[in-house]
Amino acid sequence: MRLGSAALDSAIALTVWLQIELAEPWQPWLFDIRSRLGNIMRADAIDEPLAAQSIVGLNEDELHRLSHQPLRYLDHDHLVPEASHGRDAALLNLLRTKVRETETLAAQVFITRSFEVLRPDILQALNRLSSTVYVMMILSVAKHPLTVAQIQQRLGEKP
């Protein structure tokens, strides 16, 4: 079974558009997201395992922690998008929802009726990409957004 390229192609297209629309601070994030989406497409197309890949130096576990505990790590609580969050957050939310749609489609394709997960690597990668874009949204609305180096330092601190 294959996910096919339509959903991934659409997510890549939106990522490329945001690379044009958004300012420099987001470029490394978007470059890595675009790369990850392309690697997912390739792994799906040729049925090979998907290798681990960081986004701006953050691994999948770190991205998961950031998205689930933003107040602890990013100094901003969870958010529900609204117009007052501004243009960057709105554009990033379009990408987040596109990645989530792709993840949902992947779940339909790669989880059998007996609940066997055929491509856990692709499902987890898509889930972490939506987490990544959610983290970007939070950083875009924070009064004093943290740098990646500051985020990495906080992730390394003991609770």
PLM region descriptions:
Residues 1-159:
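Phosphate/pyrophosphate-binding loop motifs in nucleotide- or prenyl diphosphate-using proteins
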